[in-house]
UniProtKB/Swiss-Prot annotation:
Keyword annotations of the record: Amino-acid biosynthesis, Cytoplasm, One-carbon metabolism, Pyridoxal phosphate, Transferase
GO molecular function, one term: pyridoxal phosphate binding
InterPro entries per UniProt: PyrdxlP-dep_Trfase, PyrdxlP-dep_Trfase_major, PyrdxlP-dep_Trfase_small, Ser_HO-MeTrfase, Ser_HO-MeTrfase-like, Ser_HO-MeTrfase_PLP_BS, SHMT-like_dom
Role this protein plays: Catalyzes the reversible interconversion of serine and glycine with tetrahydrofolate (THF) serving as the one-carbon carrier. This reaction serves as the major source of one-carbon groups required for the biosynthesis of purines, thymidylate, methionine, and other important biomolecules. Also exhibits THF-independent aldolase activity toward beta-hydroxyamino acids, producing glycine and aldehydes, via a retro-aldol mechanism.
Species of provenance: Staphylococcus aureus (strain bovine RF122 / ET3-1)
A GO CC annotation given for this chain: cytosol
Catalyzed reaction equations: (6R)-5,10-methylene-5,6,7,8-tetrahydrofolate + glycine + H2O = (6S)-5,6,7,8-tetrahydrofolate + L-serine
In-chain residues carrying the UniProt-annotated modification N6-(pyridoxal phosphate)lysine: 226
Highest taxon of source: Bacteria
SUPFAM superfamilies the UniProt entry points to: PLP-dependent transferases (SSF53383)
Location (main, coarse): cytoplasm
Cross-referenced PANTHER family: SERINE HYDROXYMETHYLTRANSFERASE (PTHR11680), SERINE HYDROXYMETHYLTRANSFERASE 1 (PTHR11680:SF35)
Gene Ontology terms: biological process: glycine biosynthetic process from serine; tetrahydrofolate interconversion
UniProt gene name: glyA
Protein name, as recorded: Serine hydroxymethyltransferase
Length: 412
């Protein structure tokens, strides 16, 4: 920070305050994590200076021999992690990875089957406000009203009725194991291609704790942060037959020069994910999520689908204690717990209000939180939300958060 402090005190102060916020708060946003110092060092390296349009060995600029090394390593490590035939590590984000697949697999106006955003899908899976919903004819599938799990019979029925050219599996707020084999069977039945967006569960897949979609899907997209614990970015994994189309769609199709400093950071993160302790970490992520869900149930909260198989827990706060998701998010933030309001299946509230909150265990698990710590987290959440107008109780919750975060300091 010494160079930033000398050059730009305002930015240096903002960065320092953000570090203090991360260190003193319990981070429960399911899509966030804490990268290693090695990942941060790679992302802040001299590679940020290098333009490298093209791909390793096929660049439009000179002087790319060393970024060729880092990008090639990122590709090879990603292939090893997921067993993919081809990998493109250049997408700047998960959304751009999804866009590239759509451009390869679809024509404007084609029909696509994707998960309803309110049921746990993602903006890029056909939301009307997103490019995906504007450019393509998305038909939405959802979860069963009683079980709050994906209804594969409904997916099949919709596929047979609408004959989509592409089926999209994957979610941003779905806490159960996704059956990619069933999705593949449905896609084959209607002669559709299958794309899986595994952004949220990529780390679990890499560790063998969730079925690997690469075996079944024509295209797999992901972010490289979240459970994978790398820098913010995207990635596409596909079968060899789609290699040329995917690569030319990313560059020169929708992107120019790749962010080679970010790609180097991806390579470092993938290397970390190939180590044995990464599986141990992911196992703890899932254990902690199950403990968090069970402890909240014991505190009287209704958990969407009754529990979790992965890293996230969706809580129906409106149905449990009468608070909206927005009110719950603000209350928890006031005591040092960061989460996000989230719609739940069949939610009647607006997206900026919601009936639920989404909680995730990856970031706090990276800090070292174990099952006992997450039992305490659940009790603090309950104390704060059930006493959202009681300053004395909120202060007690705040003090308990401070005690927990002091036990598990960040980057120390």
């Amino acid at each position: 920070m010494s160079y930033i402090t000398k050059q730009d005190k305002v930015i240096a102060e903002a960065i320092e305050r953000e570090f203090q916020r991360q260190n003193s708060n319990i981070e429960l946003i399911a899509s966030e994590n804490f990268v290693s110092e090695a990942v941060m060092e790679a992302q802040g390296s001299v590679l940020t200076n290098k333009y490298a349009e093209g791909y390793p060995g096929r660049r439009y600029y000179g002087g790319c021999e060393f970024v060729d090394v880092t990008e090639s390593i990122a590709i090879d490590r990603a292939k090893a992690l997921f067993g993919a035939e081809h990998v493109n590590v250049q997408p700047h984000s998960g959304s751009q990875a999804n866009m590239a697949v759509y451009l390869v697999a679809l024509e404007m106006g084609d029909t696509v089957l994707g998960m309803n955003l309110r049921h746990g899908g993602h903006l890029t899976h056909g939301a009307p406000v997103n490019f995906s919903g504007k450019f393509y004819n998305f038909v939405e599938y959802g979860v069963d009203k009683d079980t709050e799990r994906i209804n594969y019979d409904e997916v099949r029925k919709l596929a047979l009725e609408h004959k989509p050219k592409l089926i999209v599996a994957g979610a941003s707020a779905y806490s159960r194991t996704i059956d990619f084999k069933k999705f593949k069977e449905i896609a084959d039945e209607v002669n559709a291609k299958l794309m899986v967006d595994m952004a949220h569960i990529a780390g679990l897949v890499a560790a063998g704790l969730h079925p690997n979609p690469v075996e079944y899907a024509d295209f797999v997209t992901t972010t490289t942060h979240k459970t994978l614990r790398g820098p913010r970015g995207g990635m596409i994994l596909c079968k060899e037959e789609y290699k040329k189309d995917i690569d030319k769609t990313i560059f020169p199709g929708i992107q120019g020069g790749p962010l080679e400093h970010v790609i180097a950071a991806k390579a470092v993160a993938f290397g970390e994910a190939l180590e044995n302790n990464f599986k141990t970490y992911q196992q703890q992520v899932v254990k902690n999520a199950k403990v968090l869900a069970e402890a909240l149930i014991n505190e009287g909260f209704r958990i969407v689908s009754g529990g979790t198989d992965n890293h996230l827990v969706a809580v129906d706060v409106k149905g449990s204690i009468g608070l909206t998701g927005k009110e719950a998010e603000e209350t928890l933030d006031s005591v040092g717990i960061t989460c996000n309001k989230n719609t739940i299946p069949f939610d009647q509230e607006k997206p900026f209000v919601t009936s639920g909150i989404r909680l995730g265990t990856p970031a706090a698990t990276t800090r070292g939180f174990d099952e006992k710590a997450f039992e305490e987290v659940a009790k603090i959440i309950s104390l704060a939300l059930k006493n959202s107008k009681d300053e004395e109780k909120l202060q007690q919750a705040k003090e308990r958060v401070a005690k927990l975060t002091a036990e598990y300091p960040l980057y120390q």
